Amino acid sequence: MRLNNELVVFDLEATSNQADVGTRPALQTNNFIIEIGAAFLDRDLKLIDTFERLVRPEEPITPFITEITSITPAMCEGQPLWKDIGPEFEAWVSRHCQNVKRVRLAAWGNYFDIPLLRRAYAHYNLPFSFSGTCIDVKTMAMAWRALSGRRTDKLGVGTVASEMGIVPEGRYHRAL
């Protein structure tokens, strides 16, 4: 399989106003990024490079977020703000392709990651140069499961990875 453009698969971890570990928060995109992880894939889906940074948020990291991500306030304390990481991320993408506007972004659940990424750039008045198609990996996994006769409710990264024979390296709810 050969793509017509390069692919940047990325994930964000973010703050939340949810403090209680026992309940799940409502979906939010107005929080601050605390970690970005990305993999740059060429047109043949070959891994070219990875990018991972912790980000200092402008609001506290709650116990809920630490519980699900293992990211503590101390880990982000001395890290740069997104105003420094955003341009670094774009420069990293630019090193691997000729036209950043044509790069395809892909994330598990575009309804969260893409708006949060756009908001982070806008918050610091940074240009958002990524204008290509955004691929929702969760939607693709849901279609694959449905076409395979499997249930599509409670669809998580762990379930799909296991069904595809992918052994995770690291922890879920960490960006890379």
What does each of the following model-derived ranges do?
Residues M1-L3:
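A short acidic-Thr-Gly-centered motif at the start of a beta-strand
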Residues N5-E6, T29-I36, F40-I71, A91-L176:
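Metal-dependent phosphoesterase core characteristic of DEDDh/y 3'-5' exonuclease domains
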Residues L7-D11:
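Short, hydrophobic/glycine-enriched beta-strand segments
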Residues L12-R24:
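Short acidic, Gly/Ser-rich segments with clustered Asp/Glu that frequently serve as metal-coordination loops
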Residues I68-P80:
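Short histidine-centered catalytic/ligand-binding loop motif
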Residues E77-A91:
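Glycine-rich, highly charged phosphate/nucleotide-binding loops
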